[in-house]
Amino acid sequence: DALNYLIFQHDESTGKMILDEFNRPLRRDELYVDGLNCNPDTFDVECYECNEHFKKNRNRSEIKSHHYIISYDPADAIECDLTGEKAQALSLELAKKIFPGYQALIVTHTDGHNGSGNIHTHIVINSVRKEAVRRQSYMDKPHEEIAGYKHRSTNKFLNYFKKEIMDMCIQEGLHQVDLLSPAETKVTQAEYMAQKSGQKKL
């Protein structure tokens, strides 16, 4: 499940959990964990209870969670004194603003992809809003702010999210790219997965 992936080490090419000599999962070397509107240790149970309360996410085909990643520039740790603890605090405050009313796991790793060392934060939210909130600027459907409404990862929402990340980085004096401009070179999902598994070409 989501919590196991975020807490324990996994082989990046196979996705399988890495075990020690006693066949126990290896905890990640450094991580920071918080829960938003939930206890992180019981995130899955609390999400299930929320879904049942609102009679949502009962079919296998329904989207039950959304996973977002905030990836900080590797130079931030060297030049800007960014630590895993500081990134966790920043990301938690951002999550409170971006995902009000949702149950969420906020987990920061300091290892990066393939040991690159870039600090990054995972935000995993239950797709069903637990509590009603004030209507937000990106909401374009009626009643989108009410409890029980399912999260919609629309372009309007994503642009709002990206701008908030950029503003946070500027405010904190961190390196950041223009997330709202199209990338010069696009990488397909197949190319990304090939790179992740260590292949140079498809």
What kind of region is each of these model predictions?
Residues 1-202:
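N-terminal nicking endonuclease/strand-transfer module with a His-rich metal-binding environment
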